[in-house]
Amino acid sequence: MAVISMKQLLEAGVHFGHQTRRWNPKMAKYIFTERNGIHVIDLQQTVKLADQAYEFVRDAAANDAVILFVGTKKQAAEAVADEATRAGQYFINHRWLGGTLTNWGTIQKRIARLKEIKRMEEEGTFDVLPKKEVALLNKQRARLEKFLGGIEDMPRIPDVMYVVDPHKEQIAVKEAKKLGIPVVAMVDTNADPDDIDIIIPANDDAIRAVKLITAKLADAIIEGRQGEDADVAFEADTQADSIEEIVEVVEGDNA
């Protein structure tokens, strides 16, 4: 049984691609049709590729892989943080700092500074410092937490990276590829899939779509770590909606 059903994908709006004028021709094989100026993603492929992504992530997690979730746009930020945390993994959901992976040593120094400031507060150092200095330290901590809080406890560069919208996260993807880190990604019709190891063709602009895919990959990690099926609810009618019905839905929604 597929880890995500056609019905779930439809309800989350995963089938909606970008306007046809904004497409990347390299995504042509993942597009079923065009309706009302919008590309319609071939969800039959999404179902199969989501299965592949699930299996890959599950197996990686079973081997104690460090997995980094990346999604910095507003539609992805909350799901990326919530699901990575639920799976006991790591995330970046604000601006990607150049060199996060390729200059890991420098990033570790910034993380060490974040931990130092937290320790100063816990040990009562803030109580004996001038208010102005404490305010500056709090400002520094807030900024460091915003950009690095999700990887504060990451023990090493990741073994796998999951990305929402590789078109936006091009720098992150390039760093991963430079270091040989496999990338699993939600790829919309405007993106270049060439640098992605496991592509999940999907609408990466809808919050529900991002949440659905991201949660399933978090489930895969949990299953891999536990060595048993995660508590995932599957739809029994996996093939309840055909690709032809998807077109009808799109036409109705864009009427």
From Swiss-Prot:
Database matches in CDD domains: RPS2
Kinase recorded as keyword: no
Domain of life of the organism encoding this protein: Bacteria
Pfam families xrefs: Ribosomal_S2
GO molecular-function terms, A-Z: structural constituent of ribosome
Gene Ontology CC entries for this record: cytosolic small ribosomal subunit
GO biological process, one term: translation
Cystine connections: none
Keywords in alphabetical order: Ribonucleoprotein, Ribosomal protein
HAMAP family (alphabetical): Ribosomal_uS2_B
Family: Belongs to the universal ribosomal protein uS2 family.
Protein name as annotated: Small ribosomal subunit protein uS2
